[in-house]
Amino acid sequence: MNLVYIHGANATSESFNYIKSKLGTGIDINYDSRNGFENNFKDMQTALQDHKDIVFVAHSLGGIYALHLANSMPNIVKGAVTLSTPYGGAEVADYAQYFLPFSRLMRDIGPSSWVMKQAKRIKIQHPWTNIVTVKGQSPFMHEPNDGVVTIASQRHHADMELVEVDCNHYEVVLSDAVVRLVEERVNKFR
């Protein structure tokens, strides 16, 4: 089994250091959010094409990449555990585009983007868990949220296991309770 760690937007693989200290190292996928989803996705496909038995551990936007990768490379993927992943898109991005019109990231992650529209249509073919973070609140969102994405967006896919944790969007990668949940799910693939 190959654990593949994919970080969230504007982060690095170091965001998984605590989780990796408990689960073990794997393949770190690093990307630059400014490059655009499609360019990063192609680079990730190339990096993973010679691997097999992949289990993704991904945070936020990293989970969207994992979903698209699993859909495009189903024979080499075993499943995934994602953290705080907004499978319905990040609603705040649709508004932020007006203030940041040149941001590729904002164009990629809004619910109306092609990336998210396609993510909503993907039928999950592998065991998949999203750890839904329910603590935190951003005043820029009218729905309950974890400080970055809405809880409803994290629950968007009904064809995966959803596990709620009392963490915000950033604390999730540092939580002992989350590490235990991730470890339990990853061990099922061993």
Residue ranges and their predicted role:
Residues 11, 123-190:
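C-terminal catalytic-base region of ester-bond hydrolases, centering on the histidine
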Residues 3-7, 14, 23-127, 138-139, ...:
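Serine-dependent carboxylesterase/thioesterase catalytic core
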